[in-house]
Each structure stands twice: as structure tokens, then as C-alpha cells.
Regions:
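Metallocofactor- and cofactor-centric catalytic cores in central/energy metabolism, strongly enriched
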Residues: 1-124, 140-144, 148-153
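Core active-site phosphate/anionic-ligand binding loop and the adjoining beta-turn-alpha structural block
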Residues: 125-166
Length: 166
């Protein structure tokens, strides 16, 4: 059996420190947390920024980094920085490096980015490789190419490959 500890629905929403400690006592194989949600709408992805304040994100992330260190297991975040855009991933990576420097710790970090070039997506749309979801508004090449951030979904395969690097 694999034990995965999920301390909260998303980084930045807060978590119960006592529940986290109880979870660590159960010797998790992995601590995982989501960094965002589509519930917030497209604004954060469009701007490439996090919904949550840097200070609260840093405080929570530092606590989870410490928990993973004490548990001796990997820590994984999905959709870093609320939206998973490259700028938001870089923002969380910067926070991670700050926490490591401030605590004198080191860590092996795998960074998965899925930013897509709007021109490539537009070409795929034109050739029928990309299609709108049912009930989606009409789109065209100009609309696609005007997007500031387009990210692809990453499946378990990418995360598993990153974890396999040690």
C-alpha cells in the first residue's frame, strides 16, 4: 500500500498543523498538495500569477518542506503557483530556494513545465488536432494566438518519471 499525505486542498488555503503531524506519524510515502484550481477562473493563468499571497505560500510551503524532510519522503506540488504557468512555477521555485537557503537545507528539485506556444496550438487547431470542448464559445486562430499563457495537463507519467530520478 502507498501512503500519500495531502495536508490541504491547495497550498495557500492553510492546513491543520496537528493533522499534518498525525499524518507524518503514519509514515507517508509521499506528501502531495495542489497549488491551484480552475475554480478561480482563467485570470491567474492569463496573468501567470498566484491567487495566494507570497508570504502565506512561503510559510505553508516551508512547513511542508520540513514535514517531508522529517518524514523522509518526497514532496510534490501540482499546478504550482495556482495556475501552473511557467512564471508561477518559477515563483514557487524561487520561494523553495529561499526556504532552503534560510534553513541551511538542500533538496533535489524536479521542475515540470507545460507551457505551450500559442502559434503551435493555433496550428494544431487549424489541422483538427485540437478541438473545443462541447458548449465552449467559438474560437479561432487569432483568439488562440492572443493567449498569454497556455499550459498542458501533466499526467501521472511525468510526475512518476520525476520521482524516479531520486
Amino acid at each position: 500500500m502507498v501512503r500519500i499525505l495531502i495536508p490541504s486542498g491547495a497550498l495557500g488555503l492553510g492546513y491543520d498543523p496537528e493533522a499534518l503531524e498525525r499524518g507524518i506519524a503514519n509514515r507517508p510515502d509521499l506528501i502531495a498538495i495542489d497549488g491551484g484550481s480552475t475554480d478561480s477562473g482563467p485570470s491567474y493563468l492569463g496573468r501567470g500569477v498566484s491567487k495566494y499571497a507570497r508570504s502565506s505560500t512561503k510559510t505553508e510551503w516551508a512547513g511542508l518542506m520540513d514535514a517531508a524532510r522529517r518524514a523522509g519522503c518526497p514532496l510534490v506540488i501540482g499546478t504550482a503557483g495556482t495556475c501552473g504557468a511557467g512564471l508561477a512555477v518559477d515563483w514557487l521555485l524561487e520561494i523553495t530556494r529561499e526556504v532552503l537557503a534560510e534553513t541551511g537545507q538542500s533538496a533535489k528539485i524536479a521542475v515540470l513545465k507545460s507551457d505551450q506556444n500559442p502559434k503551435d496550438i493555433s496550428a494544431a487547431f487549424a489541422s483538427g488536432q485540437v478541438t473545443p470542448l462541447p458548449a465552449a464559445p467559438d474560437i479561432d486562430a487569432d483568439l488562440i494566438e492572443s493567449c498569454t499563457n497556455i499550459v498542458a495537463l501533466a499526467g501521472v507519467e511525468q510526475i512518476s518519471a520525476a520521482l524516479a530520478t531520486g
